[in-house]
Amino acid sequence: MFSFFKQIFKSLKKFFFLLFGIIFVLFSIIFLETSIVQLSNNLVSTYTTLVSKTNSSDIVAPAILKEANPVYIASLTNDSGYFSKIKIDDKKINYLFPYQENDFGSDSGQSNGSGDNQNKTIPRKGDVNEKDKLFLARKRGILKAYGEANIAEKRIYKGLAVSFNNTDSFNGSDISDSITNRHIISDPQNLIYDASGNLLGYFADGLIKETISLRAGIARFPGDKGKSTGTQVKITQKQQTNNDPQKDSTVNSLYKTNNKDKVWFKSDETKADNTDISANYLFTGGNEAANWFPNLYANIPIDLEIDPGSQFWKDVNPFKEIVEEFQTQKESKDNQSFTLTFNLDISKLNKLDNEQLKWLETNAKTIANNSSFGDWDLENKLKQLKKFELKINKDWLKKKVESEKDTILNSLPGFSDSDKDTIFKTQNGMMVRNNNLSFQPSSNNLQLVQNQNSQASNGIADPNFSNVQTAYNKIHQSNNTPEKTLDAVYAAVLDQWRSIFQEDLVKKTVDLLEKYRDHFLKATAFNNIDYSKQNIAIANNVSSAESASFLVSNKDEQRYNDLSLIDGVDLKSWLFKPEQNESNPLDTIYGGQDANNGFLQKIDYEFKPSTSSGGMTASLKNTQALSPKSTKFPIYPKLANIIAQAQLPEATNIPTTALDALKQWTNLDANGFNNLKEEDKRKAANNYLALLSYFTPAFQDPNELIETNRQMLEIPITVKNGVNPLILPTDQQNLVVQTPEAHGAVVSQQWLFRHNKEILPQEGEYAWKTALQTPNNFPNWLNDLPDRYKFSINGLTFAILGIGESVETGYPVLSLQSPLPNTQDEALIFVNDQAYRSILFAVPAANQENYYAFKSTDLKQHTDQDPVQFIANRLEGYLDVPRSDLAFNVKDISKFNYLTTARNYFPDLVQSYLAIVSTVIAIFLIILALYLIILLIKSFIKKNQTEFSIIRAGGFSTTKFIVGMSVFAGIVAIVSSFLGVLFAFLLEGQVKGIINRYWFIALPENSFNWLSFFGSFFITFFVFEFISWIAFKQLFSKPVNVLIDQGNETKFSVLLHLLKHKSHTMSPLTKFRVSLIVSRFSRLFTYVGLSSVALLLIGIAGTIPQKFSAAQTSTSLNRNFNYKLNLQTPTEQSGWYAIQPYSHFGVTDNNNGIKTLYNESVQANSQNEHPYKPSNLKLKNRQDQPIKAADGTELELGNLLLPSYGGAQQLNTDENFFRHASLSKWIIDFPIRVGGSNINPWEIVEKSIPKQITQLLSASSDQFLISVLTDDFFNNLNANGFLIRNPRTNQIQLDASRVLTTIDVFNPGGVKFNDSFLSFMLKVYGDFELAKQDSKLNFGIVPVDPAIEETYTYVEGPFGFQEDNLDENSPYTLTGINPESSFVNLIDGSGNSLRNLISSDQEMNVIVNAGFQYANNINIGDYVYIKPKNTATRYSEKFLKAPLNNSTVAFKVVGVSTDAFGQELYINQHIANNLLKLSGNQGRGIIRDVIKKTNGQSQSSDEYEIDYVKPNGYVPFNGVFSKELKPSLLNKALVLNSIIGVWGNFTDFGNNFQNLVRNKLDKVITSILPTDPEIINKLAQEKQIINTTSMNYESLRKELVNKYKTEWNSVNLLSQNASSIFGNNIIAPVLNIDAAGTSAQIIRNNAEVLFNTVNQVDAFLLGTIIPFIFITCVVLGISMLEEMKRIFISLKAIGYRDVQNLISLLTFFIPAFVLALLISIGVLAGVLIGIQAVVFNVAQVFLTNVFEFLPYMVGIVLFGVTIFVIGSYFWIKLRSAELKEGF
């Protein structure tokens, strides 16, 4: 046996190459299979493990609930009812004084300085130092609540004056609207009561409001100390002179108050220790003091709650006396009301609403007792929503018609202005007005001060109920035409009110249902079922280069929190809430179960009847049920303590815990409110203030604070009814609680590594626990944190707590434009709820997805039903989705309801795909391996056949032969297995990288796969041994002597046959060579297969990148831009877009239509215009020199909105306020303190701007200011402290005290920037490079800098290739370019320019790109057809009854550009403008203004005209090419456009619009009517204007304007008709923020991601598989030579030269390689066609039709090297061989 092993080892040398070949092939098999199987297993096992360890859900139900749509049925009856007895006649100046003036005492020792004896006639009850009752605690408490922190003993205190809110007057003074002469104010007579006399609310034109609008303030008491009643204020009759009122000269002095008493308030930072209220949170304050004048401008708007609900609420209400007056001063009248009864139609409710309403009724008491929603009276509210009776005073009805008889008919259906003479019989009346105002208090402490009016009858009769009811019932009958009677008018008004109130009822019902939706579902459909509500948002980041977009996952409040933390701080531990613990995630804010620590710890009290005194008393609520007369209310002791500490610095007994505060409250309430008086009057007032703080916080539901839109809690320190007990510095009007958790995030592993970020360390100054332990230092900690530990999203900063992953975000689709996510550049982050909401607020156009998630294993515990069907059945009738989509498994690839879950099936798909690929490769390589093993064993046996036969004859068994062969088997198995697994381990990262780039799940780290090693070893070993057994079994099936004889024979049969055979056509050697190929056909097949695969892979790896590169090169030659931005086509009404370089935004450019916002002449102390002069707004350079334009004019910053009181006024009065205005957030976003009230101009503007716009501005504004302050020049200029960092928001803002002029309450026009700051600001914007970094909101001006931008005009509409077959939803647009464009080159395949083909303005030619030609198989000479729809007249055409016949336009294809990205069609821009009707002489241009006609005279007429500007060289456009990688139009300039040409503070035709255009109908109609001559002519014909053919354009349009003035003669008619034409989205962004997805840059980015991936695959192929194949070819060739060595040596022996033998060898290899080359080229051609189709469909990239032979040259060279190696080996062996070796 030993000898046998020795013989085998000797033979190894002879079979080395064949043995090496086997080892290499097996190595390849093991390497590839191990890699692929390991990757597949990693993917699937990782996914499975993740599902298991994260408690992940696998069933999804869309959170798309059916919308509530309740229906109410209304009926009209006549009924008795209660009505207010309080009457106000004049409705101009109406004061209510709850107290007598002498209630607050008089300073007997102080003289008024006049010596008038009338001073002594003031009624008073004694000196303030003697009579305690003059300082009743309640009244002093009210004063203190209004800011009188230090009440001087010797001081006259004026009472709290309350006036009804006059929206057309200014602060109660005698100033009315000079244009309308209308006084719309609150009237107590409009209070409305229910059938039992309970006060319901205030009736206002169809609505019942729960509040009445008042104004209040101690500074507004008319009169002054020492004045007698005879010298009280007299307000003169207003005289109109230039619309300005004239007052008595004494008014100003009489209205001024004594401001000598100042209060200085000092705020100390609250320490963060264990017992303090600020545990774990920061309360910002600082040692700043605020100078506050308590009597200055104290005019506070009040929305007074009419019915507080209980005596307790009255007692803590500063307007208790007024409320009581409203409640008690009522009377019952018979037949005085029209009663509208509203019944909810239960039969019309959907299943969700019906069942939820029943659930609410059943659980109303439970909800009222335990809810934090504030619905303490839910049961009664539900009853009212099901049936409500609205009692309308018939006097209101008459007064409505009477006061608006001149305009009301135009607002009523079926009536018009022409019916006035028929319906109303007018009598001339006389008005008598008494202007003497009396302020003497009445006996019941209520005085009504009013102008007395008397008015004669004007012919308006009282409504007759029977007649009105008859007319009312006819209104909704079909084909009803109302009679022209007064009763029909009354009925129409009632129906209007019915409609308004019905809508209000519907809204209230919908709001209530939606408020409890989740609670209802949890209690019903999801009862006893565990579920989570997933919240995921795709957010774009505009303020940081760290990442283009983030996938943000809210991991708060989830039952199935599928966050798996790989490393870092355990975010999940403090987010996940077990089922048994439903506390808020921010428990330390609310207190959790520890009442001593919760900042917003709520304690429930109830106010109930006292058994002893018969009054009402407050106590802790200790019963579940409330008595019928008791009221539950919450108190927030710690919040009250903070207020008390801030308000009462002299107080010494401030509790520090909730329990102490509870005791204090108990003491305060011990004797009831009626016994609050104490000897210490100051303490009594303080107690009253404390009560206000406890019981009237500004919020009812503390949970609202969690839904903050910033990474902190901001709590307004105000209480109800206008009382503001906390006097803080200007920038600290809110209590700010910094919540560190909202600044923490877990990120994806791939993104962390890509951006060189790190997780926070566990210890040290940068550890997370350090931040939590010192919350008062958190902002500084965050600022000091190195960049590697944090990242930002649009100004929000997050510390990196760890890296993690989750199932539901494992492989998401982040964009429809780019289906493959890019985990290297796109970040996946996990945050808590507060951070999630903050991101949604700071991110523009965030795409949010919400759905319910369930776990099938949990559901199976509740039912035997299929879990998906179980959930579907539970939700049937609740969700607004098809029955089949109510629920589905996340791996169901047919349900692409959510982008983020659309790829959850990916692991299974990858596994299947890799299994198929690995199987195919494995089969091929296994066949090859088996072939080589068989060849090795066969060759080895044949080589030693004689020796084996002799050994066999000596008694050697077959088993021993097999054991001997184990040497071969062992060497092959161990070497191939070890190397295969080792290389798989070493290269696993590369294999994973191809997939891992597009998956947010982190794959496990590489590890040596011992299982694969041992498995492959044993499989290889036993396969080798099995084949050996078969071979020996077959060998020894013959007798031994036969075997010995066969082994000694010389096999010359083939050679001898060829040598003896005579042939006339082929020499013997040639025949031998042919026979050599044919006799080894199996090897030929193997070589051809291997070579074909190698060449194919080389061709793919080399050709496709070349095609990608060619596509990029050809596209770059055609496109000299990065972005193509389609804008909203300007309308006729809006006019052409003005253009300016972005760095010049805000600069006046009159020649280009940008008119200044400011006037050079500013009226002194004006309150109605901007206080800025253009001459004072000239831009300066750093040397303080004016900056000039090219024509030498000095540039003025006259179009940047600057803060001013006049600007705030114009915002609500100027319908052209925003025309060509620029707005920068930092300039106006700071609090301005005006007489005790805070004004933030940005907040005013923000209300009129779409949310996504304001979010983007908010996100990027701070970045600009950082750039300003990091510039040394401007940082030095900021030494005055213009710019400061707000410590509580951590953002830079202006300091009002340093940038504004001194503010005088009587000169609000003083709200303006001072000269020092103006100089600073003008230098900032004079630095154009710096100015480009600012984000500006702009109206009507598009940023176009000729150096980096160029305009174009695109045409869209129905498109097709046949004139009669157009696709209405075609995605194609025609891009009209300047034929001399420097941004679009249009190069054909030969490198020639095609632009001259579209240079003509007359020829309708189009050039298409290669992508369009490929997608549509179109050729030069073909035609395309389009019907333009984005015309400038698209809205003007809607004025016509019969639309214009817009014809289809044909374009001839005259060229194909090599542009390969996307599908493009290019035409001449002038032709495009003509198609869109942007060109033309009349009604076209940049609209500078709408002005009154002058008619050639100095004075203007009453007619208006549009002032157009047509700059030289200007070409209309609706699109912009940009070379910038981050175009200002996309990242900085947010441009809004008004499609109606009116530029006011509105976005629709609602209240803002109506208020602005009231009495400006002529001007507005002039603006919004069509200007196109063709439409004007057709519209004139429809309006039956005669002699249209003889009129010129101006005359014809004038006639139309006059016609529409008649038809649209009211604001309501204008709004209704205009909204039907223009829709409601009338001021909108010119560029949709989402539209960037269609830009060239995005397509290019997607393509580059795809290219990079292909290159990675190519590198893998070239680096691993291809070398395997070539080495295998070399090994096979050498092994074949070993077999044929004897033949060639024999040929050499008989005289054939070595060269001839070498040629004989090449005749085998060369045909094999040529055949392989031909096969690979054919297969590659088919593969390229398929790849081209796939790439174009996925990435819209046309791979150019190029075939690269260079890769094949590389392949041929490699094969040449292979043949050379084989030939060299053959040559060496042949040269050194002796003849005996051949035998």
UniProtKB/Swiss-Prot annotation:
Family the UniProt entry places it in: Belongs to the ABC-4 integral membrane protein family.
Keywords associated with the record: Cell membrane, Membrane, Transmembrane, Transmembrane helix, Transport
Stretch list, region Disordered: 105-125
Organism per entry: Mycoplasma genitalium (strain ATCC 33530 / DSM 19775 / NCTC 10195 / G37) (Mycoplasmoides genitalium)
Membrane disposition: Multi-pass membrane protein
Pfam families cross-referenced by the UniProt entry: FtsX
Regions that span the bilayer: 16-36, 917-937, 967-987, 1010-1030, 1084-1104, 1660-1680, 1709-1729, 1730-1750, 1752-1772
Entry protein name: Uncharacterized ABC transporter permease MG468
GO cellular component: plasma membrane
Subcellular localization, as worded in the UniProt entry: Cell membrane
Domain of life: Bacteria
